[in-house]
């Protein structure tokens, strides 16, 4: 389920789009959102959906552990050399917005060690509704919320909800059990975001990530055009 409106602008260039050897670097997409909203599950589903057609890698962020990276490794969504972790040691937004050096180094190391990449997914540690990525780190941002957090979250807004290039309302299958009104969430998201796209998804089905994967494909096409 999704709102049928799209934002067609090409992916913004966050930094030099060329590597030192002159080749085009990978498109970088950041995924942020509150703790437990389903960021890692979405990353895993995207890897499964795209790994046959794109050369991709993942950088995860946790404060003191490698928990999210270890989950992806256990799920075998990508070969181990394509998954790396940053231990931020501080609030998650610091490493994706204020001091992006560790994440930039992780991304560049992946490109050096794995070879040419089409896409790098950078997953933030769980944060609040104000979390945003530096455009020096990523070219596009996805923000993930879930219905269990309350159907008033889109109305409350915040930079993540209002300005991310894509908003995902996740775990729609739980709506009947937690009393969330999906139509209200969709309408509030549209009011907060205007023409920016929104996807309502449940990853319980095999094609649950299809719309988000299609959005990523559009960004890749714009990046390589």
Curated annotation (Swiss-Prot):
Spans annotated as Disordered: 1-21
Biological process (GO), any one: urea catabolic process
Superkingdom assignment: Bacteria
Gene Ontology cellular-component annotations: cytoplasm
Pfam families: cobW
Entry GO MF terms: GTP binding; GTPase activity; nickel cation binding
Residue positions binding GTP: 33-40
Keyword Chaperone appears in the UniProt entry: yes
Location of this chain's protein in the cell: Cytoplasm
SUPFAM superfamilies, A to Z: P-loop containing nucleoside triphosphate hydrolases
Family as reported in the entry's similarity comment: Belongs to the SIMIBI class G3E GTPase family. UreG subfamily.
NCBIfam families assigned: ureG
Assembly information from the UniProt record: Homodimer. UreD, UreF and UreG form a complex that acts as a GTP-hydrolysis-dependent molecular chaperone, activating the urease apoprotein by helping to assemble the nickel containing metallocenter of UreC. The UreE protein probably delivers the nickel.
Name of the protein in its database record: Urease accessory protein UreG
């Amino acid at each position: 389920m999704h709102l049928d409106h799209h934002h067609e602008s090409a992916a913004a260039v966050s930094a030099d789009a060329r590597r030192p050897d002159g080749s085009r670097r990978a498109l970088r997409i950041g995924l942020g959102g509150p703790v437990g909203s389903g960021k890692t599950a979405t990353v895993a589903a995207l890897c499964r959906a795209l790994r046959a057609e794109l050369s991709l890698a993942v950088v995860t962020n946790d404060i003191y552990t490698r928990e999210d990276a270890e989950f992806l490794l256990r799920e075998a969504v990508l070969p181990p050399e394509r998954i790396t972790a940053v231990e931020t040691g501080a609030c998650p937004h610091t490493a994706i917005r204020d001091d992006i050096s560790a994440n930039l180094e992780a991304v560049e190391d992946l490109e050096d060690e794995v070879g040419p990449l089409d896409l790098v997914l950078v997953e933030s540690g769980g944060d609040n509704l104000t979390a945003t990525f530096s455009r020096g780190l990523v070219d596009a941002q996805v923000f993930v919320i879930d219905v269990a957090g309350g159907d008033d979250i889109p109305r409350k807004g915040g930079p993540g909800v209002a300005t991310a290039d894509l908003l995902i309302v996740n775990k729609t299958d739980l709506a009947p059990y937690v009393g969330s009104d999906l139509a209200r969430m969709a309408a509030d998201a549209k009011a907060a975001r205007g023409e920016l796209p929104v996807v309502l998804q449940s990853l319980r089905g095999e094609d649950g990530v299809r719309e988000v994967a299609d959005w990523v494909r559009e960004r890749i096409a714009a990046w390589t055009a």
